[in-house]
């Protein structure tokens, strides 16, 4: 099945992934590509529509991102957002001006609903603005289709060429008509069908993996988390016993997790599974290391080394499966965005790795991965398992990792997860865990002074891990968790709850 494709061209905006999610919510497949993508590559991909993202630059900046003018003559509908809107105008000989003050926040906008872009919408609504420059003169063949008090051209169109630009951000919730507008672009302008689904995605991946692998042997980096589990099942459905799953028990797992992983994949899925006990090896490499980036790199490299050693025992192995997903790629940096932190599935890979990668989920957000898992018949409990980073508890123990610190974190985390489950909050909270900051504090237990560790509890609500908010857990649940941890984990005398959203914080502490 040939899927309809929309290209999201990345100019470095903070909402790029959100644009992609909005497109996919309409059952339309999209890919994010850098603005440096050539016309030839775009033609080869044959998209049905193109969306330019926003970005931090001015079109007059010395190193401002550009596109070839020929792109606007391909006959492919284009929607420019914010910087993408200004770039379209600038490229087609319109004029972009820098005003005395910027326009930011919720803004009333006047819409021309005779335009296909604003079909069936109110004439006045609310949008979200975040710009300094604006279009002061539209290019030849264009007309203005939206205005605000501060922005004489809040949107423009060349309906004949199917070129559209909006100065506001339709992808964010604060633009009340944004989802409807994007839907109009996809279905009224691009004439798409919206027939992409998780079942069709799984079918396409299984077919592609069969063709790519042939009769070669494959190993899978299995952690037991949602991402690697779904990746393993997709590949197993494609090639069966040609796949061997290697589960590295690095001693950085949650309580009883190693045994649970082994049971699920051996008993329920009948997969070839090798469990490698490598705790001493990993802790030895991590000894004396406090920097979180170094910890991630060390763990990523050791993972690959273990796989290489196991592969040699198995014979001729050609491919390695990883559960990399879209947010992993974004957080590891692109041509137009800074690196937030290197991801264990991306930045930690050694350059001399001997395997070719299979990453069947690299185009999906977490909620889409779960949907694929359900399609594949993976048990609901496993599909909705808590997200868990590849480096495991090593990045939830701040500073140097030791067996003692791991044991403290593991027990506190188990109590937190148990009480969340008892309260019926498991599927209402995206992610929740305990971590061990490198902090000790004075306390009193009985009649004695204590000087013990602090445990930080982190719980967030999200749909894709790109943004998140701290979870409003009932006080009585937090109270019970706190009392249990300080009573059952003797090395702890203080519990704190993290009430920071993402951004500015990331979900994990390291």
Swiss-Prot record:
Binding site for ATP: 223-229
Reactions catalysed: XMP + L-glutamine + ATP + H2O = GMP + L-glutamate + AMP + diphosphate + 2 H(+)
Pathway: Purine metabolism; GMP biosynthesis; GMP from XMP (L-Gln route): step 1/1
InterPro entries: Class_I_gatase-like, GATASE, GMP_synth_C, GMP_synth_GATase, GMP_synthase, GMPS_ATP_PPase_dom, NAD/GMP_synthase, Rossmann-like_a/b/a_fold
Coiled coil: none
Single Gene Ontology MF annotation: GMP synthase activity
Residue span(s) of domain Glutamine amidotransferase type-1: 5-195
Assigned GO CC terms: cytosol
Active site: 82, 169, 171
Matches recorded under Pfam families: GATase, GMP_synt_C, NAD_synthase
Its EC number(s): 6.3.5.2
Keywords (A to Z) from UniProt: ATP-binding, Glutamine amidotransferase, GMP biosynthesis, Ligase, Nucleotide-binding, Purine biosynthesis
Leading EC class: ligase
UniProt domain GMPS ATP-PPase: residue ranges: 196-385
HAMAP family named among the record's database cross-references: GMP_synthase (MF_00344)
Subunit structure: Homodimer.
Main function: Catalyzes the synthesis of GMP from XMP.
NCBIfam families cross-referenced by the UniProt entry: guaA_Cterm (TIGR00884), guaA_Nterm (TIGR00888), PRK00074.1 (NF000848)
Protein's UniProt name: GMP synthase [glutamine-hydrolyzing]
The organism of origin for this protein: Clostridium botulinum (strain Langeland / NCTC 10281 / Type F)
């Amino acid at each position: 099945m040939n899927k309809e494709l929309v290209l999201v061209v990345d100019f470095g905006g903070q909402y790029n992934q959100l644009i992609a999610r909005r497109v996919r919510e309409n059952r339309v497949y999209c890919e994010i590509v850098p603005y440096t993508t050539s016309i030839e590559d775009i033609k080869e991909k044959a998209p049905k529509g193109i969306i330019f993202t926003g970005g931090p630059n001015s079109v007059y900046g010395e190193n401002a991102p550009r596109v070839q003018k020929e792109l606007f003559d391909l006959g492919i509908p284009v929607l420019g957002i914010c910087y993408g809107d200004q770039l379209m105008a600038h490229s087609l000989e319109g004029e972009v001006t820098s005003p005395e003050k910027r326009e930011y926040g919720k803004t009333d906008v006047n819409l021309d609903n005779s335009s296909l872009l604003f079909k069936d919408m109110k004439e006045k609504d609310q949008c979200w603005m975040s710009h300094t420059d604006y279009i002061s003169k539209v290019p030849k063949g264009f007309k203005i289709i939206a205005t605000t008090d501060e922005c004489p051209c809040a949107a423009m169109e060349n309906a004949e060429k199917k070129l559209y630009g909006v100065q506001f951000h339709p992808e964010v919730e604060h633009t009340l008509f944004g989802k409807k507008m994007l839907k109009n672009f996809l279905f009224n302008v691009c004439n798409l069908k919206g027939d992409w689904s998780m079942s069709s995605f799984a079918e396409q991946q299984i077919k592609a993996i069969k063709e790519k692998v042939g009769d070669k042997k494959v190993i899978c980096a299995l952690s037991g988390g949602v991402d690697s589990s779904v990746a393993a099942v997709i590949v197993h459905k494609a090639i069966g016993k040609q796949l061997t799953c290697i589960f590295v028990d690095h001693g950085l797992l949650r309580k009883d997790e190693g045994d649970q992983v082994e049971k699920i994949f051996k008993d329920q899925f009948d997969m070839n599974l090798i469990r490698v006990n490598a705790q001493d090896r990993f802790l030895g490499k991590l000894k004396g290391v406090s920097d979180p980036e170094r910890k991630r790199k060390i763990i990523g490299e050791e993972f690959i080394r273990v796989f290489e050693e196991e592969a040699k025992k198995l014979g001729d192995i050609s491919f390695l499966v990883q559960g990399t997903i879209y947010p992993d790629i974004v957080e590891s940096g692109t041509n137009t965005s800074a690196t937030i932190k290197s991801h264990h599935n991306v930045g930690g890979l050694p350059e001399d790795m001997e395997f070719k990668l299979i990453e069947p989920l690299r185009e999906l957000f977490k909620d889409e991965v779960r949907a694929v898992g359900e399609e594949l018949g993976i048990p609901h409990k496993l599909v909705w398992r808590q997200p868990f980073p590849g480096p495991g508890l090593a990045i939830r123990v701040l500073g140097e990792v030791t067996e003692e610190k791991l044991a403290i974190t593991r027990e506190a985390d188990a109590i937190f997860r148990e009480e969340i489950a008892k309260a019926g909050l498991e599927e209402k909270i995206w992610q929740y865990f305990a971590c061990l900051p490198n902090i000790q504090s004075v306390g009193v237990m009985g009649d004695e002074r204590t000087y013990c560790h602090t445990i930080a509890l982190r719980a967030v609500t999200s749909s894709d891990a790109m943004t998140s908010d701290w979870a409003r857990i009932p006080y009585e649940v937090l109270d019970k968790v706190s009392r249990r941890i300080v009573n059952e984990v003797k090395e702890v005398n203080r519990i704190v709850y993290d009430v920071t959203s993402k951004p500015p914080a990331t979900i994990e502490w390291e």
